Amino acid sequence: MRKTINCFIPYRESTAAEQTIHALKESSIVNKIYLLNIEPNKTLSTPEGCEILPVDSLTSSKTMKMIAEKADTPYILLYTKTSALELAYKALERMTDFLQDRECGMVYADHHEWKNGEKKKHPVNDYQPGSVRDDFDFGPLLIFNRTEFILASLQMTEERKYAALYELRLFLTLHSHLVHINEYLYTETESDNRLSGEKQFDYVNPRNREVQIEMEEAFTRYLKSINALLEPICVETDVKKGNFEYEASVIIPVRNRARTIDDAIRSALTQETRFPFNIIVVDNHSTDGTTEIIGQYKDNKAVIHLQPQRTDLGIGGCWDLAINHPRCGRFAIQLDSDDLYSDTHTLQTIVDTFYKEQCAMVIGTYRMTDFRLNTIAPGVIDHSEWTKENGHNNALRINGLGGSARILHTYPARNRRAQCQLRRRLCPGTHFLAPI
């Protein structure tokens, strides 16, 4: 059978590397295996039938261009992890079948992963035109059409240390498709066992700032290439629009947070303001005693306890329920059920900012702590990824504006006719505060 794949894998001497190399050699269509050594000063033994390539980074433009130069087969396999790879029966043949389509530039597949000693299914999503987040989950096994890979690499004119693979994928989409194979074709070992709620803050971790700057530069260049880069537009919002009994509402969606919900409510109640405000707690069918704790405030008119009749509301549905409640204030202020305000003047600061900036949304800086209020990694989240010049574009690339106190002007959020205006104003009209 014709050997149609050159493989490129990160390499360090380990049992996992041996297993991956063995799995690739078992395939009759693998031509050569290149081992990417990110520690060039370290002497490594070269497994039979392989070639070691010293690289500065697995995600640099130099590495991508080296791969393009070395590849002399129709397809390029790139494995992005150092954990052991197990291939399903004729998995590579199956993946390259899809690459025979002229419009297919890259394929990726569903897979299994070993996590904490248990083998679990790991399905991935179809790639769509708007799938531009730099952390889109393709899985670690990617196979490219060599011609398309080279064409994309030639469009990468800037030197990148961290964002080259991301940029290559973006440019790949300009002239080919990224195809998801809805079959479980391999197994890998998950090495990042953090909860998804912890992983979502990676993009704001100060230690990753240099990476994020490169990612933004690559994404901005891509937007320019497709004429999709939006210029900043300064549009003021009439924050006085609408009639409201309360100037502000602190909205706390909650489910099973018996340990923290009382502290969150008390933190809101101790706010000192020059305007009337209330607290809307949306209790999404808690079962751990949270409901009873909220019930202790039944005689406090400032605390509204909502219990949805529906059982299919996530946090977004709970937010929508609260914003459309007749007693919701002019400004809907998010407070997570395990969060506290940093001082008693936070609400006043937020509302003052709305009137000063005439903006549609305010987002606050915050600090990550443990239950004893000791600062934990990544520490202060100041959302440096947002700038007045390019934040509205960069927001498409990042994992939301995660964890922040997000505050909306209620009127446009409620009214469908005004929602198109809100969408236009939300990005250029978003203002960021110091820690709240």
Q: Which residues make up each language-model segment?
A:
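Glycine-rich, basic loop-to-helix element that forms the pyrophosphate-binding segment
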Residues: 56-70, 309-327
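A conserved hydrophobic helix/loop-capping motif in glycosyltransferases and polysaccharide synthases
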Residues: 5-16, 27, 248-260, 264, ...
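A recurrent flexible, glycine/aromatic-enriched loop bordering the glycosyltransferase active site
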Residues: 120-144, 149, 385-406
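Acidic donor-binding loop at a coil-to-helix junction in glycosyltransferase catalytic cores
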Residues: 159-168, 423-432
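A conserved acidic beta->alpha catalytic loop
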Residues: 37-44, 84, 283-292, 311
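Short beta-strand-to-loop acidic/aromatic patch adjacent to the donor-nucleotide binding site
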Residues: 72-86, 329-340
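Conserved donor NDP-sugar-binding/catalytic core segment of glycosyltransferases
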Residues: 84, 89-121, 345-378
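Short, acidic, metal-binding catalytic loop of nucleotide-sugar glycosyltransferases
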Residues: 22-31, 266-276
